[in-house]
């Protein structure tokens, strides 16, 4: 019993086992670049090392047939680890850390696989890329190597959990997962039902597919340290919308208040912020990895360009329309308007069925 209020306080007898962390995961462009250091030779060596680790993550994605959002999560955790703790200049040690990061991402985002699956594929990567393994020589004993990699994985996984402070469910980092949630079948069937058919059936499916690709390709640069997943989703839609306008339909424009309707209530950023983030993204590309997937000058996006493909009353702010908010509905907060909407959808489906019969 609480002596002051006379009420039962469960935390006195059963305190929280782990205090929920609130870590900082978003940084300025300057902070990210400064993390590389000022020594030219060490910076070049570190970037080469990081690029090899990113190659490893992509190799594991293909080898284990991982979902896109699992690969994205692994990349997010990799850059966060690098920013806070750095990487060993020993390539094999960094691969071991990357392996633990990948396993943690799999456990966070999807069903875990047997540990042997990770170890086997990691050994294959090390062998294919001829990464030196101690004194084992160019052709190490695979059975011995697997046991060594297995032991390192178990050790590093425990270490990683502590280093991240058990903060793996921030909920705003994984843009690849978020874009599927924002445009899930539920929302397409309800919230987006009023959108023009030409946009829903012709333009948007192509833009959405390209946006998914934009997000996955973005994981090869530390852009996840620059902005959260929600902003990166909006950036992907803006970028791919501009590309669609340039390559397919010169008159393309998103429907009125499209972004205001799909954003969460807590989100609010203006066009200028998006322009600055695109520019910072380009600066990161110039300072980190020279890859075929880099967007280069296409990231020079102005406010005018964004306004030419959007039509928002309140910039990029939520419209406060909670009618189709799945989180509210799941908690039982269902409005009369939503019930009437569902009834109209059921009636329409029934009439469509009758005409076929």
From Swiss-Prot:
Assembly and binders: Belongs to the BUR kinase complex.
InterPro entries reported in the protein's UniProt record: Cyclin-like_sf (IPR036915)
Gene3D superfamilies: Cyclin-like
Encoding gene, per UniProt annotation: BUR2
Compartments where located: Nucleus
Main subcellular location: nucleus
Function per UniProt: Component of the BUR kinase complex involved in transcription regulation. This complex phosphorylates the UBC2/RAD6 ubiquitin-conjugating enzyme (E2), leading to monoubiquitination of histone H2B and the silencing of telomeric-associated genes. Also required for histone H3 methylation. Necessary for the recovery from pheromone-induced growth arrest in the cell cycle G1 phase. The kinase activity of the complex requires the presence of BUR2. Overexpression of BUR2 interferes with mitotic chromosome segregation.
Signal peptide (residue range): none
Species, as recorded: Candida glabrata (strain ATCC 2001 / BCRC 20586 / JCM 3761 / NBRC 0622 / NRRL Y-65 / CBS 138)
Protein's UniProt keywords contain Cell cycle: yes
An annotated GO cellular component: cyclin-dependent protein kinase holoenzyme complex
One of the record's GO molecular function terms: cyclin-dependent protein serine/threonine kinase regulator activity
Keywords: Cell cycle, Nucleus, Transcription, Transcription regulation
Protein name: Protein BUR2
């Amino acid at each position: 019993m609480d002596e002051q209020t006379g009420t039962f306080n469960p935390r006195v007898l059963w305190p929280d086992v782990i205090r929920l962390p609130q870590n900082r995961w978003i940084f300025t462009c300057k902070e990210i670049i400064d993390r590389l250091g000022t020594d030219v030779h060490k910076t070049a060596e570190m970037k080469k090392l990081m690029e090899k680790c990113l190659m490893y993550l992509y190799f594991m994605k293909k080898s284990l047939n991982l979902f896109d959002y699992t690969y994205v999560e692994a990349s997010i955790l990799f850059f966060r680890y690098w920013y806070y703790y750095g990487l060993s200049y020993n390539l094999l040690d960094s691969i071991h850390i990357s392996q633990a990061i990948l396993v943690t991402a799999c456990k966070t985002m999807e069903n875990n696989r047997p540990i042997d699956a990770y170890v086997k594929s990691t050994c294959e990567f090390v062998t294919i890329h001829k990464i030196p393994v101690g004194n084992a020589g160019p052709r190490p004993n695979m059975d011995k190597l697997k046991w060594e990699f297995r032991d390192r994985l178990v050790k590093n996984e425990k270490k990683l959990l502590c280093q991240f402070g058990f903060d793996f469910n921030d909920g705003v980092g994984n843009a690849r997962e978020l874009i599927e949630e924002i445009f899930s079948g539920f929302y397409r069937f309800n919230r987006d039902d009023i959108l023009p058919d030409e946009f829903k059936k012709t333009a948007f499916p192509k833009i959405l597919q390209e946006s998914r690709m934009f997000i996955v390709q973005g994981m090869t640069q530390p852009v996840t340290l620059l902005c959260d997943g929600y902003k990166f989703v909006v950036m992907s839609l803006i970028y791919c919308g501009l590309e669609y306008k340039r390559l397919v339909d010169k008159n393309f424009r998103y429907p009125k208040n499209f972004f205001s309707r799909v954003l969460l209530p807590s989100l609010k950023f203006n066009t200028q912020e998006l322009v600055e983030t695109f520019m910072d993204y380009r600066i990161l590309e110039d300072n980190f990895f020279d890859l075929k997937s880099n967007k280069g000058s296409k990231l020079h996006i102005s406010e005018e360009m964004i306004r030419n493909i959007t039509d928002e009353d309140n910039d990029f702010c939520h419209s406060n329309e909670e009618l189709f908010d799945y989180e509210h509905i799941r908690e039982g907060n269902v409005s009369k308007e939503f019930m009437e909407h569902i009834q109209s959808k059921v009636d329409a489906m029934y009439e469509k069925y009758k005409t076929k019969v």
